[in-house]
A protein has these predicted regions:
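TRNA-binding/sensing appendages of the translation machinery
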Residues: 1-88, 145
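Positively charged, Gly/Ser-enriched RNA/tRNA-binding surfaces
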Residues: 2, 28-40, 52, 87-99, ...
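Short, surface-exposed recognition loops or helix-turn segments adjacent to catalytic cores
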Residues: 162-173, 190, 261-268
Length: 382
């Protein structure tokens, strides 16, 4: 290949083509996930790839405004963003629905690409397909159980096994620090220690360092973690959160006894707008997070609505899946009866038509990965 040819075929770092095998897997995963969401009552919506930046923070308390592509709309001269997360868009759509209705739980699903200027350690790709569900105005415990269970069902449908649910409490450390009335500077120091889970440094935090270190040390298998957390003297709001987590774990175990549950009470990376309950989904078969979600607040005309969501990222799925295209492929020689092709396709055959005038070219059939060849009106296995 000439140097000129090499230059024009380069793609930006973290931006990739999906070739035949991965493209098939991507389509299969998309269709199967969305069908599973639909069967659980989630209705699909399709927000645009780009919209006004002001919409991004209108309904959620906190969003990731740093890692985002920005442009200016040449028509309105207003700043716009290329989405790096679809959840804020679903929050916008849900807000319109909640404004028009009362006493109704809203279930929405979505799928689409997101684009990020910089990849992360967990997700180095910059263009990723994201699929997910959002549940609004359901009680937090039953809502969390429904969303997590729906995610487990969907991933099981696409043959991802050995699932692990890692439950976190993004707001737990904040509850402890607020109760201790720490200064802003001490809170920032504490958050930096918690982020890297430096137990010795956490212990040095005045007033609440001992409690925070015990919370950090409780991480692990859910029964062990909950047992340790229940021994800690926590403020009422924190105790209520621990009780809710315990109920969620019990219900998930009943619904999905083969799924492992762990608890990491101080983990909050990637849970920007989540509060209360958060979770991530892993498989022991792949070293990458498959999905994440949790509880958040939707602000609408001064009223707060409870949201519970799940986002599944395809970079991890495409590494985890072993799905193959097993659809039958039949090689059609140059001279054939055209009337038979429609019937073959109707019966699920992929037809590969030869442009080679040779009568029965079995070698050519193998090149196109055909398992069968058409001989007259009969299909013969190669």
């Amino acid at each position: 290949m000439k140097n000129y040819d090499k230059k024009i075929t380069l793609l930006p770092r973290g931006i990739n083509d999906l070739l035949e095998k991965k493209s098939f897997q991507d389509s299969f995963l998309s269709q199967t996930l969305m069908n599973s969401f639909k069967l659980n009552g989630y209705e699909k919506v399709n927000p645009p790839m780009i919209e006004f930046e002001e919409n991004y923070t209108l309904f959620l308390d906190t969003t990731n405004k740093q890692n985002i592509f920005r442009i200016v709309d040449p028509i309105s001269n207003k700043p716009m963003y290329i989405r790096n997360d679809i959840t804020p868009q679903i929050a916008r759509i849900a807000a319109n629905k909640l404004y028009k209705t009362t006493d109704k739980v809203i279930r929405l699903s979505y799928i689409g690409d997101v684009l990020r200027p910089i990849g992360s350690q967990l997700h180095p790709e910059r263009q990723i397909k994201q699929a997910g569900i959002e549940l609004y105005d359901a009680p937090n415990v039953s809502g969390a159980v429904e969303v997590i269970s729906t995610g487990i069902q969907a991933l099981t449908e696409i043959e991802i096994s050995n699932l692990i649910i890692d439950i976190t409490m993004p707001n737990l450390a904040n509850l402890i620090m607020d109760n201790a009335k720490l200064s802003g500077q001490l809170i920032q120091s504490a958050k930096s220690y918690l982020k890297v889970k430096n137990i010795n440094k956490i212990k040095t935090i005045p007033t609440c360092g001992k409690i925070l270190s015990k919370i950090a040390d409780s991480a692990g298998e859910n029964e062990r973690a909950l047992s340790k957390l229940n021994l800690i003297d926590l403020p009422p709001k924190a105790k209520k959160l621990i009780k809710d987590i315990s109920l969620i774990c019990d219900k998930i175990k009943i619904l999905h006894p083969n799924v492992k549950i762990t608890i990491d009470p101080i983990e909050n990376r990637g849970f920007n707008y989540y509060s209360g309950i958060g979770f991530a989904i892993f498989s022991s078969n792949v070293k990458r997070e498959l999905g994440f979600g949790g509880e958040y607040t939707l602000n609408l005309n001064g009223k707060k609505h409870n949201g519970m969501g799940l986002s599944i990222l395809f970079d991890g799925l495409l590494r985890a899946t072993q799905i193959k295209d097993n659809q039958k492929r039949v090689f059609i020689p140059y001279k054939h009866k055209t009337s038979i092709l429609a019937e073959l396709r109707k019966n699920g055959w992929i037809t590969i038509i030869s442009h080679n005038k040779k009568a029965l070219n079995k070698e050519e059939a193998k090149i196109y990965n055909c398992s069968h060849i058409l001989n007259g009106t009969k299909i013969e296995e190669l």
